[in-house]
């Protein structure tokens, strides 16, 4: 038996300023503290405490048909660990810029560029031991540096009363991508170490939707991502997907949905991985929503998932050899107050 004891605090203060030279924005500070103590047969982490302090800001302004947004964030993180491994103390600086161009009625073209820095997590720094939930033996790396990436994303949007669509293309370049690298494998049990290497990820995501009438709306969607670490395939990268969905709002209370998607084979796999077969997924749902007093709301729902009872394997999982849930049914209640 393993016991996880986590105690943490988090606070955030934001200041929204009046327009300055037509720039509007918000600045703020954020602070958090977390103590983690893991005991038992799966105690993969020594007791540790993470303190993090952040300063952030976002500014935006309209220039005719162009909307410009700038953002920045400065993080300081300290991780104290109760072991012979060295403590972590570091800073990260991120910034971004975005331009949205309303070049025609109902159309918008967007371009986003950013430099992102991520501080390593305690798990990535200090893990040491068997983690049977992922069927791995994990080795942390207290020599990890900040993960740094330069990113660009291009998007096209269209939206009117009936038809809407969007397409996004993105590319991310990493100087020192942090990932769980498999060093060895016995049957399906892996020895992994948190490592850093140059990497790049690029892909696309798109959706087109059509509102037939006040009740029915249908959409087509798809996404694809490709990951490379140095010249090799990145591990646990999900396969491409295409699908269609129909939503129905029958009245103020009843709604329903049906979705079909096809996930392709993933034949671009990393060392110690294997090809993952694709599958077809069919899900349906029905819900009844009603309002209560004082703005409270309740929704009773029924979902039927994987109606084809497909053998589903997720390449992005550490347990990609274990099938996901087959045909299943869910009944539940959502209550908002």
Where are each of the predicted segments found?
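Gram-negative outer-membrane beta-barrel transporters
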Residues: 25, 170-174, 192-269
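Residues on the lipid-exposed face of transmembrane beta-strands in outer-membrane beta-barrel proteins
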Residues: 11-17, 55-61, 97-101, 154-158, ...
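Face-selective signature of the C-terminal outer-membrane beta-barrel domain
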Residues: 1-102, 114, 158, 163-171, ...
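C-terminal beta-signal and adjacent terminal beta-strands/loops
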Residues: 117-118, 173-175, 253, 265-267, ...
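Transmembrane beta-strands of outer-membrane beta-barrel proteins
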Residues: 25-29, 68-70, 109-111, 165-167, ...
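Outer-membrane beta-barrel translocator domains and adjoining extracellular loop/strand segments
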Residues: 1-2, 37-44, 80-88, 123-128, ...
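Outer-membrane beta-barrel signature, preferentially recognizing the C-terminal barrel domain
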Residues: 87-88, 94-102, 108, 115-166, ...
């Amino acid at each position: 038996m393993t016991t996880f004891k986590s105690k943490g605090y988090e606070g955030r203060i934001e200041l929204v300023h009046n327009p300055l030279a037509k720039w509007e924005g918000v600045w703020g500070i954020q602070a958090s503290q977390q103590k983690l103590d893991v005991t038992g047969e799966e105690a993969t982490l020594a007791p540790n405490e993470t303190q993090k302090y952040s300063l952030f800001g976002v500014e935006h302004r309209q220039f005719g048909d162009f909307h410009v947004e700038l953002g920045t964030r400065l993080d300081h993180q300290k991780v104290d660990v109760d072991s012979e491994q060295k403590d972590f103390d570091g800073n990260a600086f991120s910034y971004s810029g975005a331009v949205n161009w309303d070049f025609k009625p109902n159309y918008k073209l967007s371009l986003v560029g950013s430099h992102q820095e991520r501080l390593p997590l305690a798990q990535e720094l200090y893990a040491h031991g068997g983690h049977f939930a992922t069927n791995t033996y994990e080795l942390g790396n207290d020599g990890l540096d900040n993960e740094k990436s330069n990113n660009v994303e291009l998007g096209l949007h269209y939206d009117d009363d009936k038809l809407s669509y969007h397409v996004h293309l993105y590319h991310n370049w990493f100087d020192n991508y942090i990932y769980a690298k498999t060093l060895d494998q016995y049957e399906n049990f892996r020895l992994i170490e948190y490592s850093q290497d140059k990497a790049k990820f690029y892909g696309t995501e798109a959706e087109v939707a059509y509102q037939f009438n006040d009740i029915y709306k249908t959409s087509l969607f798809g996404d694809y991502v490709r990951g490379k670490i140095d010249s090799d395939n990145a591990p646990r990268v999900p396969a491409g997907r295409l699908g269609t969905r129909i939503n129905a709002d029958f009245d103020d209370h009843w709604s329903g949905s049906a979705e079909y998607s096809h996930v392709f084979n993933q034949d671009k796999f990393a060392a110690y991985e294997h090809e993952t077969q694709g599958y077809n997924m069919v899900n349906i749902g029905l819900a009844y929503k009603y309002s209560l007093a004082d703005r409270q709301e309740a929704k009773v729902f029924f979902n039927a998932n994987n109606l084809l009872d497909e053998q589903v394997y997720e390449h992005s999982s550490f347990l990609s050899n274990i099938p996901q849930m087959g045909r299943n049914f869910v009944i539940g209640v959502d209550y908002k107050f």
